[in-house]
Amino acid sequence: EFNILTSELRVDYIIEKINEYGYSGDHIHGLIFCSRKDECEKLSQLFNLRGYKTIALTGDSSEDMRQKAIDSLESNDENSLDYIFTVDIFNEGIDIPKVNQVVMLRPTESAIVFVQQLGRGLRKNDSKEYVVIIDFIANYEKNFLIPVALSGQTNYNKDSLRQFVCEGSLMTPGASTIQFDQITEKRIYQSIDAANFTQVRLIKDSYKQL
């Protein structure tokens, strides 16, 4: 599994997509959420070999190292960081206003965590007009959590979630745009159809939102 997560083919695909969707502003200030420590560290190395300036931060990273990385990501200096790869940290309680691209490489296990990670890029800043969120969906069984998180619907109504996938941008307030490619849309529909919304974990997630 590790070899697949860090394969040259996967790295090329990730880079292709982050370049395709781009960012707002003069410089990239990106956060990339990974699923495991070894993946986080290896992907950072592979990005660096391709000319990006990145660092991997995990729960083992010191507070000083984290702060220096954040300061560098926020900077526009020539040698400042383009991306921070992270796992197990930055879900909440961290403020990096210049973040203009958030990349999800980890499975969506919880609507709450998904929103927390997405929120790292939602701080207002004069250097950007919007934030780009790119989610490389991997956990097919839990894909229904994506419309749950983005819509704010906590009743887990399947018809409402299907409608949001179909008409997300029309149902989202403000100038936000939500776009699913055809494969992603199909997998989310399949996940909604197969989901058992009486599971204990979903009930716990809903309770935490109260």
Regions found by a protein language model. Give the residues of each.
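Conserved helicase ATPase core of P-loop NTP-dependent helicases/translocases
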Residues: L31, C40-S44, N48-F90
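Short glycine-/polar-rich loops that comprise or flank the Walker A/P-loop
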Residues: R50-K53, P97-Q101, E109, D126-V132
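Conserved interdomain linker/interface between the two RecA-like ATPase lobes of SF2 helicase motors
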Residues: E1-L31
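Conserved segment of the helicase C-terminal RecA-like domain
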Residues: S110-Q116, R120-T154
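SF2 helicase motor core recognition
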Residues: I84-V102, L118-R123
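Amphipathic alpha-helical transducer elements in NTP-driven molecular machines
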Residues: E8-D12, Q67, Y83, V87, ...
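Long, largely alpha-helical accessory region at the distal end of helicase-like NTP-driven motors
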Residues: S24, I146-L210
